[in-house]
Regions:
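Zn-dependent metallo-beta-lactamase
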Residues: 1-21, 26-29, 35-37, 181, ...
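Active-site neighborhood of phospho(di)ester-bond hydrolases with catalytic His/Asp-centered motifs
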Residues: 21-25, 47-63, 78-81, 126-131, ...
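Active-site-proximal loop/helix segments of hydrolase catalytic cores
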Residues: 105-166
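Active-site HxH/HxHxD metal-binding segment of metal-dependent hydrolases
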Residues: 38-94
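Active-site-proximal beta-strand elements of phosphoester/diester hydrolases
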Residues: 2-5, 20-23, 97-103, 124-130, ...
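Pre-active-site segment of Zn-dependent metallo-hydrolases
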Residues: 16-52, 64-68, 132-143
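Active-site beta-strand termini and strand-to-loop segments that position acidic
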Residues: 13-17, 93, 119-122
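Binuclear metal-ion centers of metallo-dependent hydrolases, dominated by the metallo-beta-lactamase
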Residues: 84-96, 110-111, 162-215
Length: 215
């Protein structure tokens, strides 16, 4: 399994011979970075086998890229109902079963369309977008994750407790700003929490960095 960070909170996942882009092209929403032009150009010239989109916020979603992908009929697009071209159904991609789950954005009192995804292949991968960690507390109806791809809230305070309880061997933390431009103190909060409460292997990839996890 190969995971490449391509966006603020998104990755290109290569699993069982399939390339799946998950929230993988985004715009800048300060202090969170945009997809670098070189990475975007590469993705446009070699389109993935499927797109998974969690929600419509610009730090997770780029309408022009999705439209281009659909026009080239490159593959299925899963996402919430308020994003054009998407469907909300589970599907099978090669050896991978993809579950599309209705979920709730962190801290959003007002309704917001949001999906999370569980991918079951040779490894089980959870990609949660900006879903609240509380949604997964004491859940027994979903397959145990091998790898979780999650935003910073899952490594701070009670979010880390829930993350550890789910039993993943590896956690890839996304949606962090540059350490030099962190007005909310997220890096410090993550560092303190993880130091005080050791858990699964934690990866915090830089933009464009690739993580190889043996299958």
């Amino acid at each position: 399994m190969l995971i490449e960070r391509t966006a603020c909170a998104g990755v290109l996942l290569t699993l069982d011979g399939k390339r799946i882009l998950m929230d993988g092209v985004c715009r800048e929403v300060k202090p969170y970075p945009a997809t670098p032009p070189a990475i975007r150009t590469r993705l446009e010239s070699s389109l993935p086998d499927a797109l998974l989109l969690t929600h419509k916020h610009e730090d997770h979603y780029d309408e022009a890229f999705v439209s281009q992908y659909v026009q080239n009929a490159a593959g299925p697009v899963l996402g919430p109902a308020d994003i054009p071209y998407t469907n909300q159904r589970d599907l099978t991609l090669g050896n991978i079963r993809i579950l599309s789950l209705e979920s709730r954005h962190i801290g959003k009192a007002q309704p917001l369309e949001h999906r999370s995804f569980v991918l079951r292949g040779s490894k089980c991968v959870w990609f949660l977008g900006d879903a609240s960690p509380l949604l997964w507390k004491n859940r027994s109806d979903l397959p145990k994750p091998d790898v979780m791809l999650v935003p910073y809230a899952y490594a701070i305070g009670s979010g880390w407790d829930i993350c550890r309880s789910l039993g993943a061997s590896s956690v890839v933390l996304l949606h962090l700003p540059q350490q030099s431009d962190d007005p909310y103190g997220l890096w410090e909060a993550v560092t303190q929490t993880v130091a005080q409460h050791p858990g699964p292997a934690l990866y915090i990839p830089k933009m464009g960095e690739r993580i190889l996890i043996p299958e």
